[in-house]
Amino acid sequence: MEWNYLYNHFDPVAFDLWGLKVHWYGIAYVLALLVALWVAKWIAKKDAYPLSNEQLESYFIWVEVGVILGARLGYILFYDPFTAYYLTHPWQIFNPFQNGEFIGIRGMSYHGAVIGFLIASFLFAQRHGVKFWMLMDLVGISVPLGYVFGRIGNFLNQELIGRVTEVPWGIYVAGVLRHPSQLYEAFLEGIVLFVILYAWRSRVKFTGQLGIMYLILYALARFVAEFWREPDAQIGYLVGGVTMGQLLSLAMAIPCLVLWGYLAKKERGKIL
């Protein structure tokens, strides 16, 4: 079986469970969460974070709810062409059925997930008396490896496809050779970010630096990866050939840079 024709021989459905189709994407998503939690526990123990495994497990449940809500709502607001419909029919936003058939919840936005994650993290920190910025540092270094599985899930689900190409490692999608952009993102936004953040741990100057650094680096990696990724059909290219993903990444990076400067200045003030 040739790599270029992988999709012709691959079924995105892993197996049926009592009539319910379980997709490889769903399995990859669960693995992403478990890997991120495992890395968080490992780093928390290695770097002596004042958090127990029970607290981390509880925190990840909060975060998972926030991520799902934020990702879905973010997609509706940023990408979906039927935003007005969903705003007037909010009960349809999380409806996993279509014409009586279970199709799961489709349409998620990373940038919306970040917003949901931040809100859930803030509420958890307030509820349990945990430092918010400490959580950001821990998550910033634990998310990237889990993210790798998320993008692999996108690849197996044949979604978020790449742009048309002639490179020998391209993959045919509906008869058209395209970049396997999901795998590029898994490498850039996952593996590369983890290596950088892991190495930076010993150089941290203020609490929250790793968390903010992750968002800035992700925005940069995503901006670059978008040049290989096909823009959403319902949106296409924006002004100057920029994609919605690139625009949202810039919108995320700019306030993060400002926040970095503010927290760094605040820390220097403590030292002086």
Curated annotation (Swiss-Prot):
Membrane topology (UniProt): Multi-pass membrane protein
GO CC annotation: plasma membrane
Keyword terms, alphabetized: Cell inner membrane, Cell membrane, Membrane, Transferase, Transmembrane, Transmembrane helix
Residues noted as binding a 1,2-diacyl-sn-glycero-3-phospho-(1'-sn-glycerol) in the record, renumbered to the chain: R151
Pfam families documented for this protein: LGT
Listed transmembrane segments: 24-44, 59-79, 102-122, 129-149, 180-200, 208-228, 244-264
EC main group: transferase
Physiological role: Catalyzes the transfer of the diacylglyceryl group from phosphatidylglycerol to the sulfhydryl group of the N-terminal cysteine of a prolipoprotein, the first step in the formation of mature lipoproteins.
Entry's family note: Belongs to the Lgt family.
Name listed for the protein in its UniProt record: Phosphatidylglycerol--prolipoprotein diacylglyceryl transferase
Gene this chain is encoded by: lgt
